[in-house]
């Protein structure tokens, strides 16, 4: 299991939100490229970049994403946020991202099938859960699907690289990830899963590492790295124990 530092972009800055709320923002850097480079220099194998402007319907920051990708090369970068059509997915891949993270449109079976055909193993499907349902449109609306139902539908139709599971109620809280739900999603879907949301300590990472054999490939860590609650080298050591 690997640790994937998160770099969330909003209005040109590096920020973290709490529970996905645009009005609960903490700015950690005015220079996202420098922040991404810092994580790469400290040993990150992969970065998770989220374009929050795109997620909330504002113009996407493709140029900034391209700068980050170039600055951290050869570290792999996955990019999400507002990728709701084929052109948007293609744009981030052309900007150098290794994977595009798709959320809202993943509920459309035809779209998932087309993604698998056009970009095999280059797409990660975000499974964002709130109150037992999949949230969409920047985590604002709830769908009728459960996370397991979405994962099984994706497995049937698309050649995706992984699922990114986030328990929204824990995101940005540092209160611990939903280990049980993450492991269950990995086991039942048969698709590699990246855990996200709530990591606040090395114990949280160790808890995920302990069940990594269920199919948990990595964990995205945001606020805990930025506040210093955990260091990246220590987090990587804790995660590797479950590899």
Regions found by a protein language model. Give the residues of each.
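C-terminal helical cap(s) of enzyme catalytic domains, especially alpha/beta-barrels
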Residues: 110-118, 123, 209-212, 216-243
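Charged helix-capping and loop-helix junction motifs
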Residues: 59-66, 140-149, 175-184
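Conserved, mostly hydrophobic/aromatic
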Residues: 8, 39, 47, 92, ...
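Short, acidic/polar
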Residues: 28-40, 84-90, 143-154
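Structural preference for beta-strand elements that scaffold enzyme active sites
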Residues: 2-6, 46, 74-78, 98-101, ...
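Catalytic cores of alpha/beta
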Residues: 72, 77-99, 111, 180-217, ...
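Glycine-rich, proline-tolerant flexible connector loops at the mouths of alpha/beta enzymes
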Residues: 46-64, 164-174
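Conserved anion-binding
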Residues: 11-23, 90, 97-171
């Amino acid at each position: 299991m690997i640790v994937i530092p998160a770099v969330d972009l909003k209005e040109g800055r590096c920020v973290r939100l709490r529970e996905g709320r645009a009005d609960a923002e903490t700015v950690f850097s005015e220079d996202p490229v420098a922040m991404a480079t810092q994580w790469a220099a400290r040993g990150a194998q992969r970065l998770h970049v989220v374009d929050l402007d795109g997620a909330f319907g504002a113009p996407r920051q493709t140029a900034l994403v391209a700068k980050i990708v170039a600055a951290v090369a050869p570290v792999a970068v996955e990019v999400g946020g507002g990728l709701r059509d084929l052109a948007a997915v293609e744009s981030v891949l052309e900007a150098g991202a290794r994977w595009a993270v798709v959320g809202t449109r993943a509920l459309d079976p035809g779209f998932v099938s087309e993604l698998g055909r056009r970009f095999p193993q280059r797409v990660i499907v975000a499974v964002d859960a709130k109150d037992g349902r999949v949230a969409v449109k920047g985590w604002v609306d709830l769908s009728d699907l459960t996370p397991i139902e979405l994962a099984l539908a994706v497995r049937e139709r698309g050649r995706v690289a992984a699922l990114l599971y986030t328990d929204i109620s824990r995101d940005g809280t540092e209160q611990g990830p939903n280990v049980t739900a993450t492991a269950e999603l990995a086991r039942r879907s048969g698709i590699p899963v990246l855990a996200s949301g709530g990591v606040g300590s090395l114990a949280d990472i160790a808890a995920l590492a302990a069940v990594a054999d269920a199919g948990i490939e990595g964990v995205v860590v945001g606020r805990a790295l930025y506040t210093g609650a955990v260091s990246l080298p220590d987090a990587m050591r804790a995660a590797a124990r479950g590899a």
